[in-house]
UniProtKB/Swiss-Prot annotation:
Heterotetramer with large (RRM1) subunit. Interacts with p53/TP53. Interacts with RRM1 in response to DNA damage. The active site is at Y138. It catalyses: a 2'-deoxyribonucleoside 5'-diphosphate + [thioredoxin]-disulfide + H2O = a ribonucleoside 5'-diphosphate + [thioredoxin]-dithiol. The keyword Nucleotide-binding does not apply. InterPro entries: Ferritin-like_SF (IPR009078), RNR-like (IPR012348), RNR_small (IPR033909), RNR_small_AS (IPR030475), RNR_small_fam (IPR000358). It comes from Pongo abelii (Sumatran orangutan). The lineage of its organism: Eukaryota, Metazoa, Chordata, Craniata, Vertebrata. Its main location: cytoplasm. SUPFAM superfamilies: Ferritin-like. GO terms for biological process: 2'-deoxyribonucleotide biosynthetic process; deoxyribonucleoside triphosphate metabolic process; DNA repair; kidney development; mitochondrial DNA replication; negative regulation of intrinsic apoptotic signaling pathway by p53 class mediator; positive regulation of G0 to G1 transition; positive regulation of G2/M transition of mitotic cell cycle. Pfam families: Ribonuc_red_sm. One of its GO terms (cellular component) is nucleoplasm. This is Ribonucleoside-diphosphate reductase subunit M2 B. Its cofactor is Fe cation. Fe cation 1 binds at D100, E131, H134.
Amino acid sequence: MGDPERPEAAGLDQDERSSSDTNENEIKSNEEPLLRKSSRRFVIFPIQYPDIWKMYKQAQASFWTAEEVDLSKDLPHWNKLKADEKYFISHILAFFAASDGIVNENLVERFSQEVQVPEARCFYGFQILIENVHSEMYSLLIDTYIRDPKKREFLFNAIETMPYVKKKADWALRWIADRKSTFGERVVAFAAVEGVFFSGSFAAIFWLKKRGLMPGLTFSNELISRDEGLHCDFACLMFQYLVNKPSEERVREIIVDAVKIEQEFLTEALPVGLIGMNCILMKQYIEFVADRLLVELGFSKVFQAENPFDFMENISLEGKTNFFEKRVSEYQRFAVMAETTDNVFTLDADF
């Protein structure tokens, strides 16, 4: 992927062009406060980026584990689902189970090594932790619903067994491997992974909640979509701090590319019609989500799409940490977001 060949590089061979692109990116990295190497990266205090630190504390406050999701009521619902509904849900879970591992690959291989600001490194470290929880949760859901070992194995190997999952995975993996692209381009690409590639699937599971189905699955979906909304907001915050941002044209190109892949995934490869949703409205919803992401990145809308799903009005991807502040199901770690003075222990109380 990366930028088209520059005219001034037309006479260079491929290795020379690659070296030229890499050197140019290194120069640009040195101009970025977020990426500039410093011994300060080993020490958290004093906080230099309070808004980045606040997002880290939000992530910390919303930590949860797979064991806290009750799946005991899901199996009776699962057994009553139509074959098409089971097919759709199991394949969506297979996509999710693989995707969180890819997000973590990027965080470990690229972002955590490139970013030098300790507040952001704290966030990425916690994101890696919660992405592991997400992956475990999706694997546990597959393990609970799918009793046939061969079907289970097929789903756990979705990147190899399902071409449409592989297509989405390959798109993300190419960005991890791309040494020519700038940090800003890759921030946008992974905001698209978490903000666009996940959005339609989240909406499909919320649709099941609207129908009163699968309480364990839908509760875990609330928690995970809240987390991913925060991760997407964090990517947009990091983007705002960049000195050398990609052009609006380049950002649009990346996000529109992701939109096309996601629309194909949920309206052709794994159509939401299988669970009774409208494919045309799903296409519109994905465009709406993409427009919202573009606005949060500081650019104008491409699609001018309205939200066609009323039941998606209040979830995390709707806007800046809305869902977090709503505290889904009152689920937030006690005192993590409280002011320090709220939790001071004193010995002068009357007993």
